[in-house]
């Protein structure tokens, strides 16, 4: 099944994707928010937080950018096959530069927070993005008035680790692993997986 989907993406027509004309730059990959790599990521946010658009700085290397886009789309298909939640993703274009749109998974009354912010909520200052750290945070959150299903929380983190191993993802860190915080119930859960390339 995945090979059939891979063939579908091999002949992708990016021009048929969305045209994003109301976006604003929210983050560039690399240290201090500025791209330091030859092929850094550039993130844009659609109005009202509906989605984010990710592209790359490699404007003269279309094949590399297209392969990264295809990788992101294939990872979404893999997530679906192995039962890991992943937001809707589709190819898009902004000012003639191709990328992918990842739609917001937070519903009304929910906030999307990254692992770094989650560590701060749990008053955990020595966060190192390890499995043990997430188990510790799941134990600590109720102390600060948050609800968490520890078993599901830790299980979801393990699934992500296994998925990243299978897909050779070496860039999963505290700023691209997300959690959903329900503002009324104060429940925290692992968010669908984004930024898989």
Regions found by a protein language model. Give the residues of each.
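Phosphate/dinucleotide-binding and metal-coordinating scaffold of catalytic cores
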Residues: 1-162, 166-169, 178-197
């Amino acid at each position: 099944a995945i090979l059939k989907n891979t063939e579908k993406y091999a002949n992708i027509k990016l021009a048929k994707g969305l045209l994003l004309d109301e976006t604003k730059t929210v983050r560039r990959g690399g240290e201090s928010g500025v791209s330091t790599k030859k092929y850094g990521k550039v993130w844009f946010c659609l109005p009202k937080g509906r989605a984010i658009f990710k592209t790359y700085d490699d404007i003269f290397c279309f094949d590399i950018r297209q392969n990264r886009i295809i990788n992101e789309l294939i990872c979404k298909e893999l997530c679906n096959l192995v039962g890991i939640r992943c937001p809707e993703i589709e190819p898009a274009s902004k000012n003639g530069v191709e990328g992918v749109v990842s739609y917001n998974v937070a519903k009304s009354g929910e906030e999307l927070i990254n692992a770094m912010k989650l560590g701060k909520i749990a008053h955990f200052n020595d966060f190192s993005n390890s499995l043990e750290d997430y188990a510790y945070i799941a134990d600590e959150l109720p102390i600060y008035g948050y609800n968490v299903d520890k078993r599901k929380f830790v299980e979801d983190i393990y699934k992500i680790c296994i998925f990243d191993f299978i897909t050779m993802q070496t860039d999963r860190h505290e700023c691209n692993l997300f959690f959903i915080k329900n503002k009324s119930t104060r429940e925290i859960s692992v968010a669908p997986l984004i930024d898989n390339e």
